[in-house]
Amino acid sequence: MPINIVDSIGSVDDAIEKNEEIIEKIKAYGNKLFSTVDTSQCIDANTLISFEKGIEIGSANYYDKEIENSTPYIRVGNLLNNNYDTYCIDNDYKKCDYNDILIAFDGAPGRNSIGLCGVYSSGIYKVICDSKLKGFVYFYINSDLLQDIIKQNSQGTTILHASKSIKLFKMPSVNNIILNNQLNDLYNVLINLYKKQISLKKIKQLLLNKYFD
């Protein structure tokens, strides 16, 4: 049993845990900052943001591990842990980059994430907005203001659907430049931390593969 691999896996696990703690603290701070935004006069959110729905490629096109020329296929479950467990061959499907905001309206309405790169499924929408508003929009999406609207308009028994709630979204005006810049800075830090997290998980998997060879 190569003890150096075991030690390395433990060290990577520690780094993943520490990184996750930092992510949660930054998200909490960003949410606290956003809670200071004046919500007494909200505007139609659809004037500032839009949503691009992903595509279902079919399970016949899934790969359970990364192969040559493949790209991650992101499903609703991946938004929870920011991990990749399914891959596909890129055939000009709907794509997202690390700095895109992804949100689910089917299955787990309101669940969202950033820091993922690949092809995204039909249960997920990519948020389209001005890059200067990414931080504001991200923390708006995670606020009670929006999550409550999604929750109240989720329909279905076995699988919840909430895409019809999009037209009801109300968003505070972006009139505090300093606050907007602060939220954008936090957003960019989160993107880098999530990218680091994915890299650490890949390293861990490589070490595990080496250990079990």
Question: Predicted segment positions?
Answer:
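Short alpha-helix capping/helix-loop boundary micro-motifs
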Residues: 85-92
